[in-house]
């Protein structure tokens, strides 16, 4: 008799980037009265909530350092490993860099799940590292009450081409490289409401490496770049706006989304992170419908890149996207700050 399939999501209270501590609570945790250590070679720290730290090692080269880890968002161990690795490596691409090495972070409930299952998880992470052209060079593990996997990733970038989330300019168009709705579809699967024709869509979206980010870095007109993960599109766009001193207009109908997300929202397939996200930054957003809120605040795991692009660089961005098999269209634009308007406004 065959043993029953393992459902990893049943062993964790959270899922993927939806496990993130909310922005509001995180602000309290990170607040400090201590004087910060100043290092002139640290080009990007945590002041602007960027995707990774960047350190200038000289000769125009910066070292990128980042880490990301979470609990299972899918049941299959190998796919969990793939998704966790893709998500962690993405932060390097979001800074405009190329990954060169990774080490694993593993928490495993050894009294509940066999080590052979953890091996499959690590194999999934190793597979993605090979796709990215890097070694999974080591790691650290602990006995934990819930399964956790992530990577600490090192990358390199030209110091002239670092893409921060705080350098966007008014007049930039906004582009998004992956569709929204990952949290919604994975919640539908967890609730056994996912239709057969939609199985695997979210997983394959999450497993797409954000490699184009390393190529977008060569375009000066890409003024800011970040990846859309646990805080949802509105959360990560608000970080760009606040860091850059600009405001945004989003065209809801132009935003790419996974199939049938509106139907799944109507069926109650909304992750808990959506509400926590809105509670943290909803006061910054203009009027929007409940449906728009559920999609735009949906926590993404291993989501796409969000780019702010000057008008004269749009063609270059679209050309690079085409080389990677993507077709990109603007989903909104950035405007000068105006206290009479919301930080982000949603139009049809």
From Swiss-Prot:
Identification of the protein by name: Selenide, water dikinase
UniProt GO molecular function: ATP binding; magnesium ion binding; selenide, water dikinase activity
Class of enzymatic activity (EC top level): transferase
Keyword Protease: no
Known catalytic reactions: hydrogenselenide + ATP + H2O = selenophosphate + AMP + phosphate + 2 H(+)
Residues that hold ATP according to the record: 20, 48-50, 68, 91, 139-141
Annotated GO biological process: selenocysteine biosynthetic process
Binding site residues for Mg(2+): 51, 91, 227
Keyword rRNA-binding: no
Enzyme Commission (EC) number: 2.7.9.3
Family: Belongs to the selenophosphate synthase 1 family. Class I subfamily.
UniProt keyword list: ATP-binding, Kinase, Magnesium, Metal-binding, Nucleotide-binding, Selenium, Transferase
Self-association and partners: Homodimer.
Gene coding for it: selD
UniProt xrefs under SUPFAM superfamilies: PurM C-terminal domain-like, PurM N-terminal domain-like
Organism name: Yersinia pestis
Database matches in Pfam families: AIRS, AIRS_C
GO CC annotations on file: cytoplasm
Active site: 17
HAMAP family named in the record: SelD
């Amino acid at each position: 008799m065959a043993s029953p399939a393992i459902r990893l999501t049943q062993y964790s209270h959270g899922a993927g980037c939806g496990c993130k501590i909310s922005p509001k609570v995180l602000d309290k945790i990170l607040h400090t009265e201590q004087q910060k250590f100043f290092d002139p070679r640290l080009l990007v720290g945590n002041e602007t909530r960027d995707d990774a730290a960047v350190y200038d090692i000289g000769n125009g080269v910066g070292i990128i350092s980042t880490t990301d880890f979470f609990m299972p968002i899918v049941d299959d161990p190998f796919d969990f490993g793939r998704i966790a690795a893709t998500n962690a490596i993405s932060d390097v691409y979001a800074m405009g860099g190329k990954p060169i090495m990774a080490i694993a972070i593993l928490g495993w409930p050894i009294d509940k799940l066999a080590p052979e299952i953890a091996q499959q998880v690590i194999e999934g992470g190793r597979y993605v590292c090979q796709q990215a052209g890097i070694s999974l060079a080591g790691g650290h593990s602990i006995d934990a009450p819930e399964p956790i996997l992530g990577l600490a990733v090192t990358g390199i970038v030209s110091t002239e081409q670092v893409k921060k989330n705080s350098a966007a300019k008014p007049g930039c168009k906004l582009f998004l490289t992956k569709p929204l709705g990952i949290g919604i579809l994975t919640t539908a699967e967890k609730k056994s409401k996912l239709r057969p024709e939609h199985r695997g869509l979210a997983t394959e979206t999450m497993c797409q490496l954000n490699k184009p980010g390393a190529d977008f870095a060569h375009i000066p007109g890409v003024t800011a770049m970040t990846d859309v993960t646990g805080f949802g599109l509105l959360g990560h766009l608000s970080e760009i706006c606040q860091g850059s001193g600009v405001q945004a207009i989003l065209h809801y109908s132009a935003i790419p989304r996974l199939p049938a997300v509106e139907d799944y929202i109507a069926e109650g397939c909304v992750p808990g992170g959506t509400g926590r996200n809105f509670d943290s930054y909803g006061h910054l957003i203009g009027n929007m419908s409940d449906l728009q809120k559920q999609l735009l605040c949906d926590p993404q795991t291993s989501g796409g890149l969000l780019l702010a692009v000057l008008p004269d660089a749009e063609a270059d961005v679209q050309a690079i996207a085409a080389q990677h098999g993507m077709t990109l269209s603007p989903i909104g634009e950035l405007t000068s700050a105006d206290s009479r308007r919301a930080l982000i406004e949603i139009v049809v």
